[in-house]
């Protein structure tokens, strides 16, 4: 009896050591858009995604930003387009209106829209792309040209999925080949 109790205690302790104490339910990959701006004007500017649905989830604190540049982004609301970060989305969206240290703008999380326009607001005024862009891949990289006010380059679905396929196929074949050689 004592032996069974000791075995049970050891099993319970092992289970407690192996099982994590906290669970991370939201740890999977999230869709993302990275935008590189070329030919940008000198000085501070903001870049945001314009979406067709107004939202009630505040994605930024307006007190941290220049009100004049924010107003340039919000002026598109009269045309039925709403700034995703500056105006809010129905679900959370992460990003920043200012460029990151590497000069890119990154938007991610569940609030990332499938179709959007790019809007920029700078010291000389605001502008937005004429046509909406529709994401076709999970991680999208865009190049936005300030002078032409257009998206000049986007991630190719064939290239993206081709690289993803090869990056999983080659290691899988190498591991399976190694196992076949070892146990063959």
What are these regions (language model features)?
Residues 160-184:
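Core alpha-helical transmembrane segments of integral membrane proteins
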Residues 18-29:
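Sec-dependent signal peptide cleavage junction
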Residues 65-110:
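Tryptophan-paired
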Residues 128-165:
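Short, aromatic-rich amphipathic segments at membrane interfaces
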Residues 114-121:
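A short, solvent-exposed beta-strand micro-motif common in secreted/extracellular proteins
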Residues 8-17:
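Bacterial N-terminal signal peptides
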Residues 31-39:
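A short, amphipathic beta-strand motif
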Residues 1-7:
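Positively charged n-region of N-terminal signal peptides that target proteins for export
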């Amino acid at each position: 009896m004592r032996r069974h109790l000791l075995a049970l205690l050891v099993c319970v302790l092992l289970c407690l050591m192996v099982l994590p104490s906290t669970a991370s339910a939201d740890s999977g990959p999230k869709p993302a858009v990275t935008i590189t701006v070329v030919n940008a004007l000198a000085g501070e500017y903001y870049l945001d995604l314009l979406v067709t649905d107004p939202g009630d989830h505040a994605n930024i604190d307006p007190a941290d930003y220049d009100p004049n540049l924010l107003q340039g982004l919000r002026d598109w609301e009269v045309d039925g387009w709403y700034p995703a970060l500056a105006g809010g989305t129905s679900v959370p969206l992460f990003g920043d209106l200012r460029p990151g240290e590497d000069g890119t703008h990154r938007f991610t999380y569940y609030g990332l829209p499938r179709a959007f326009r790019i809007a920029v607001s700078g010291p000389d005024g605001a502008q937005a792309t004429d046509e909406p862009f529709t994401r076709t891949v999970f991680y999208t990289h865009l190049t936005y040209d300030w002078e032409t006010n257009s998206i000049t380059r986007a991630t190719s679905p064939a290239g993206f999925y081709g690289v993803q396929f090869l990056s999983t196929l080659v290691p899988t074949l190498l591991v399976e080949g190694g196992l076949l050689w070892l146990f063959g």
